[in-house]
Structures are given as C-alpha cells and as structure tokens.
From Swiss-Prot:
Site (Plays an important role in substrate specificity) location in chain: H228
Gene from which the chain derives: glyA
Keywords: Amino-acid biosynthesis, Cytoplasm, One-carbon metabolism, Pyridoxal phosphate, Transferase
The protein's name: Serine hydroxymethyltransferase
Main location: cytoplasm
Similarity section: Belongs to the SHMT family.
Gene Ontology biological-process annotations: glycine biosynthetic process from serine; tetrahydrofolate interconversion
PANTHER family in the cross-refs: SERINE HYDROXYMETHYLTRANSFERASE
InterPro entries on file: PyrdxlP-dep_Trfase (IPR015424), PyrdxlP-dep_Trfase_major (IPR015421), PyrdxlP-dep_Trfase_small (IPR015422), Ser_HO-MeTrfase (IPR001085), Ser_HO-MeTrfase-like (IPR049943), Ser_HO-MeTrfase_PLP_BS (IPR019798), SHMT-like_dom (IPR039429)
Catalytic activity, as annotated: (6R)-5,10-methylene-5,6,7,8-tetrahydrofolate + glycine + H2O = (6S)-5,6,7,8-tetrahydrofolate + L-serine
Length: 415
C-alpha cells in the first residue's frame, strides 16, 4: 500500500530540488523557444493520473489486455476530439512523439530506397524529413526542395524537381520556416507526379486548429503533428489521415513501432484537444500571431535581419551576422539575461549546425503567460540590447533582473 503523503520531496529530496529549480526557471525566465509552451494544470493532472498504471496494447474495443473499458473511453474521447478539431476522417492518438508519427506513415507506404521529397534541413526543414542523420535519410532516397532568393519556398522549382525525380512521397512542413505553406499547391504537385502527400504540421497545429493557418487535412493523404508546441498539450504525437489508411497506420503504430500506448498521455491529449475547441483558444492564437509579428518588426527596426523578411506564423529566424555573433554565442548571452532561445541555422548558413549564424524566436510561451504587444516589444528590445552589448556584463545582469520582474507580473501558474 502506498501512503498518501509519500511525496517526491519526502522520498527523493535530490530529485525534488531539481524539479523545483526547473519550475522556478520557467517562472523567472522569458521563454522564446518556438517549440516550447506551458500546459494547463488540467493537462498535467491527466498526465499524472493513475492511467499511467494501465497497459492497453491495441485500440479501443480491440485490446490484448483485460480491464481496458475505461481507458477505451479516454482514448476514444481523444480520437473524436482531434478529428473534430481538424476535420479529419481518421485519427491515431497513440504515437509517443512526432518523430514516431512520421515513421509510422513512412512504414505504411514506403519501402527502403523509395524516393522522398522533403524540405532542405538547412532551409528550415526537420530532421525526420530526410536528414542523413535521421532514420528517414538512412532508409530512403531523399531529394530536397528549398527557398528562392527571397527566402520563400520555390513551388515552381519544387514541381520541376518532383517531375524529374518522381518521389513516392512529398512532405510539407518545417521546424524553422516563418511563412505559410501552400498545401493546396503541394497537393496538386503530388497528384501530378503520382506521389503521396504528407504534412507534418507540428509547429503550426495550434494555429491550424484556430483557423489562422492553412489546414492541410483537405489536401494531404496524411497529416502528422506533435501535441505540444502551439497546440499546448503534452509531449506526444498524432496522425490524421483519410479513412482508407486506417488499417495500415494502426498496424504500423502498433505493433510495428510501439507496444503499449501511454494512456495517461493520451488522456492529457484529450484535455488539450478540448481546450483547443474552446473560443478562448482562437483568441490565444490570434495573440500568438500578433506577438510574433511585433517582435520581428521591433528587432528589424533595431538593425537585425529577419529571415524571409517577416513572419506569418508564431516563429521567425534572426540573422546575427551583422552583429558579429554566432547563434551559439547569442543563445548563451540571452540565457544569462534570463531569455531563452535556441541557436538555429539560417538558409545557406556558413557555420556548422552546432554554431549557426542565427537564432529562432517564437511567441507561444510568452503569449500563454499573458504577454501582449506591449510586452512583446519590451522583450524584443531586451533581446536587441543584449545582442548590441555582448561584452557588457552589467547591462546583461540588469536585463536579467528586468526579465524576471516582467515574468513575475505574468506568472505562468497563479499561486
């Protein structure tokens, strides 16, 4: 029997101290990493529930274990809600991550050596879309599409390359592209060359759910996503597809790639999907766009080049070369100022991926805190002040105090 008062603090104070320190960091630091966000207490309550105790291999109504009648309800709620959210015919909510969701699609329709077209990683693509370092790049023949001289996706060149190479699959989506994808055009290109079309909307899913970014579901055979980032749920993945692919996707998630689903995480996904169906979620996403746009504008006014010249989403890249800084240096400097970003390659970056010439900035987390345009401008000016004065330790310390004071005005979790 477990005692009700057997807390982490009592049983494992060393671990409890590390958790408490991270909670304090999240409250005290301005979070600008585009892929990070804060989940609601309800999402965390579901993820920390006794559902973690239950094995449930299989799918609702078709399990390999007994005692699944209640987790069947949980998983079906998640399925029904995410289908409603994105207008999908079919959904699988079991993938443990976005990467595993992508792998399940690949295994459903591809054979080793098949040709796959994805966005160039150096132009903003994602590792799982064909990077040589990833399983996708090791198993398949990868051809890339990228950006033109205006740092916008070149759809005409994409079509030309697709006609020449005849890929079996074309992938839309990115991890560091600020503009909108033309999913309709990409779907047309895929049909023209006889390819499947998959969209990884991990970064944009919350905006899509709110109707503020193009919905790929009507145009794609498969749509994958994470459930955190802009969607503001737990860390995990989903797959949406046309109904004809249900059997193939289900069998490739389980048993090909995974065993038992994480029903406590699926419950947390169900909560997040319900949150995303509320009117307040659209208001939140509208503010995400406003905050990203005003930060990009402010940084441009302070002399920093914004890749692609603007943002049409929650994210944008900043080219640091004019400041004589690398992304690695800027990441460290801003961290000292209690502002968290990540170094990121820019198109045709002369630096290595571990150094980079840019940083990636996103607005989802600060918007969850309650920041609006005034605070976003203040944050952008703090960033610019640090980048303008990388050797001024006193200024960086003052900005750290200022950043923490701003955070305390907008706590993530009210006491």
């Amino acid at each position: 029997m477990f005692a009700a008062d057997q807390t982490i603090a009592k049983f494992d104070p060393e671990l409890a101290a590390a958790i408490a320190a991270e909670c304090q960091r999240q409250e005290d630091h301005i979070e600008l990493i585009a892929s990070e966000n804060y989940t609601s207490p309800a999402v965390m309550e579901a993820q920390g529930s006794q559902l973690t105790n239950k094995y449930a291999e299989g799918y609702p109504g078709k399990r390999f274990y007994g005692g699944c009648e209640h987790v069947d309800v949980v998983e079906q709620l998640a399925i029904d809600r995410v289908k409603q959210l994105f207008g999908a015919e079919y959904a699988n909510v079991q993938p443990h991550s976005g990467s595993q969701a992508n792998q399940a699609v690949y295994f459903s329709i591809l054979k080793p050596g098949d040709t796959v077209m994805g966005m160039n990683l150096g132009h903003g693509g994602h590792l799982t879309h064909g990077s040589p370092a990833n399983l996708s790049g090791k198993m398949f023949n990868i051809v890339a599409y990228g950006l033109n001289d205006k740092e916008e996706i070149d759809y005409d060149d994409m079509e030309r390359v697709a006609m020449e190479t005849k890929p079996k699959l074309i992938i839309g989506g990115a991890s560091a592209y600020a503009l909108r994808f033309d999913f309709e055009r990409m779907g047309q290109i895929a049909k023209k060359v006889g390819a499947y079309f998959m969209v990884d909307m991990a970064h944009y899913a919350g905006l899509v759910a709110a109707g503020l970014y193009p919905n790929p579901v009507p145009h794609a055979d498969f749509v994958t996503s994470t459930t955190h980032k802009t969607l503001r749920g737990p860390r995990g993945g989903i797959i949406l597809a046309k109904a004809e692919f249900e059997k193939s996707i289900n069998s490739n998630v389980f048993p090909t790639l995974q065993g038992g689903p994480l029903e406590h995480v699926i419950a947390a996904k169900a909560v997040a999907f319900k949150e995303a169906l509320q009117p307040a979620f659209k208001e939140y996403q509208q503010q995400v766009l406003k905050n990203a746009a005003i930060m990009a504008k402010t940084l441009a006014e302070r002399g920093l080049r914004i890749v692609s010249g603007r943002t049409e989403s929650h994210v944008f890249l900043v080219d640091l070369r004019a400041k004589g800084l690398t992304g690695k240096q800027a990441d460290a400097l801003l961290g000292r100022a209690h502002i968290t970003v990540n170094k990121n390659a820019i198109p045709n970056d002369p630096e290595t991926p571990f150094v980079t010439s840019g940083i990636r900035i996103g607005s989802p987390a600060i918007t969850t805190r309650g920041f609006k345009e005034a605070e976003a401008i203040e944050v952008a000016n703090m960033v610019a002040d640090v980048l303008d004065n990388p050797n001024d330790d006193a200024l960086i310390a003052r900005i750290a105090e200022k950043a923490t004071a701003l955070c305390h005005r907008f706590p993530v979790y009210a006491k």
